[in-house]
Regions:
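Short, small/polar-rich loop/turn modules that mediate ligand/substrate recognition or access, typified
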Residues: 181, 186, 241-243
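Active-site helix of classical SDR
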Residues: 124, 165, 173
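Substrate-binding pocket helix/loop in short-chain dehydrogenase/reductase
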Residues: 100-101, 105-113, 211
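Conserved glycine-rich cofactor-binding loop
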Residues: 11, 18-19
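Short C-terminal tail/terminal secondary-structure segment
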Residues: 2-4, 153, 231, 242-257
Length: 257
């Protein structure tokens, strides 16, 4: 039981790992002893974050845009160039867009869906061979998709594509879990509530006090909340769990979900 929550020595990739939720997870993985690759579109930021995280362990920068099929394939090939296996894939890279229904841009809708949904599909597909090489009955490989509580309930803001994309991520997680179980690859999702991140920064600045007051646990999520959930889903402790969506939201989804 001593290694139940250990991911030491595992090889992980976290997309969108240079900021926000992805950075919380990547930092947790590095500090827990996993060799962690991070990707993001901005190479200079990705490189700088990897260098900072490497002070606590091993973190490698692989800049990429997984919002296109070619970008996802290129990232998978870059991982394969350096590794013979991949134990953990965290599909976190994502985008949002808010606009009134009558004015919602078609290209914005496509951008959000391409990155948030198709990006997960393509990257997981291209990395399945490496995930399968790491997998066994006793130690399945892991895919962790980052959804949102906005995919579980109707958001108050007019983020039509974002909430639709996250609902799609949750169901894609279940479909992939069913299809990949035979290769001993387990697939689960995390649905974050409010966390301090660049994507949420303006919302928290404007509505933070109200968000804390109305949250059943009375606060906004901390990095350790996200890192701990991801480490659980990446460790032996979750080896018999697949196809689930775990809200990490302080109880918001119990009230509205």
């Amino acid at each position: 039981m001593n290694d139940l929550f250990s991911i030491e020595g595992k090889v992980a990739l976290v997309t969108g790992g240079s900021r926000g939720i992805g950075l919380m997870i990547a930092r947790g993985f590095v500090e827990a002893g996993a060799k962690t690759y991070i990707s993001s579109r901005k190479a200079d930021v990705c490189d700088a974050v990897a260098a900072e995280l490497s002070k606590s362990g091993t973190c490698i920068s692989l800049p990429a845009d997984v919002g296109t099929e070619a970008g996802a394939k290129g990232l998978a090939e870059a991982i394969a160039d350096g590794e013979t296996r991949l134990d953990i894939l965290v599909n976190n890279a994502g985008a949002t867009w808010g606009a009134p229904l009558a004015d919602y841009p078609d290209d914005a809708f496509d951008k959000v869906m391409n990155l948030n949904v198709k990006g997960i599909f393509h990257l997981t597909r291209f990395l399945t061979p490496l995930l399968a090489k790491a997998a066994s009955d006793e130690s399945p490989s892991r895919v962790i998709n980052i959804g949102s509580i906005d995919g579980l309930q109707a958001p108050t803001m007019e983020t039509y594509a974002y909430s639709a994309s996250k609902a799609a991520v949750h169901h894609l997680t279940r479909v992939m879990a069913h299809q990949l179980a035979g290769q001993r690859i387990i697939v689960n999702a995390i649905a974050p509530g409010p966390f301090q991140s660049k994507m949420m920064a303006e919302t928290i600045r404007t509505f933070g006090d109200n968000m804390r007051a109305t949250n059943p646990l009375g606060r906004i999520g901390e990095p350790s909340d996200m890192a701990g959930t991801a480490i659980f889903l990446a460790s032996k402790a979750s080896a018999y769990i697949t196809g689930v969506v775990i809200p990490v939201d302080g109880g918001i989804s119990t009230r509205h979900g």
